[in-house]
Amino acid sequence: MNDRQAALDQALKQIEKQFGKGSIMKLGEHSDQNISTISSGSLALDIALGVGGYPRGRIIEVYGPESSGKTTVALHAIAEVQAQGGTAAFIDAEHALDPAYAKNLGVNIDELLLSQPDTGEQALEIAEALVRSGAVDMLVIDSVAALVPRAEIEGEMGDAHVGLQARLMSQALRKLSGAINKSKTIAIFINQIREKVGVMFGNPEITPGGRALKFYSTVRLEVRRAEQLKQGTDVMGNKTKIKVVKNKVAPPFRIAEVDIMYGEGISREGELVDMAAEVDVINKSGSWYSYKEERIGQGRENAKQYLKEHTDIRDEISKRVREEYEIDGASKEPLEETEETLSLLDDE
């Protein structure tokens, strides 16, 4: 047994000498076993994710039908990162980002890094450079479907380019995944959906870009509109369901229900009223909502308005709800400039 241990120790020393300290270790010796997270900007989604937000150093895929709220979900996460003093980048392959809407959601557009690349290769090379800098806390690519390979752009309409985009994504993710983990960057890939032709049974919906992103993603979120939110005859927004389809850091298949209001994004007050009522932090009797024996509104909309006007009570309720769900809040520390992250570019 001693000979085996001595041989193992010798092998470990050789590996560390060749590849550097920390290249191999026992899992229990790892200094950071707890998953570091950044809040998604939505209390309901933080709870559904199970760890209080998006895990750092991981790949997240957000997909769904058109106008379901995918970009809104990503912009809320960017606003949260910036509020904690972090740096965020947005690669707008669709060339459709609305700065005014982003500002309404709390994004500091003066500090947001924005790129509108011409080709898929250019977009992913920019993404790699940003990740390897070790100085970007969150990177959003909108969207995978719009990452058009250079050969397709330079070709003519009607030319067949079978599997080009899938190969591009597969190669890019092979290069990016290690750097994303080392730099602790959260990489959010927004994706669209397509339908397979001739599927008789089962779900015909697929996401573009091949299978690679499905495998590399730690979390996959499916965003879908459930119903319209109306005030009288006017449509004010949509009730949206965000389903955690895949989760490597907590149990999957949880669903977050949020109100996405036009021009405002996710209604924090709406989800707070629902989540607080679920765990009896807010009491619901008939149509009345009350907190600590004090009525805060008749009907959900009035309760939402009360919390919007009384931010101190809103924050107090939010804290209690997080405690009830054992979500202690995401990490408040921005990415530190460690020797490891700053030397990422030199590792190639």
From Swiss-Prot:
Biased composition (Basic and acidic residues): 325-335
One Pfam assignment: RecA
Acidic residues composition bias: residue spans: 336-348
Record keywords: ATP-binding, Cytoplasm, DNA damage, DNA recombination, DNA repair, DNA-binding, Nucleotide-binding, SOS response
Function: Can catalyze the hydrolysis of ATP in the presence of single-stranded DNA, the ATP-dependent uptake of single-stranded DNA by duplex DNA, and the ATP-dependent hybridization of homologous single-stranded DNAs. It interacts with LexA causing its activation and leading to its autocatalytic cleavage.
Family membership: Belongs to the RecA family.
Name of this chain's protein: Protein RecA
Organism: Listeria seeligeri
Lineage, top ranks: Bacteria, Bacillati, Bacillota, Bacilli, Bacillales
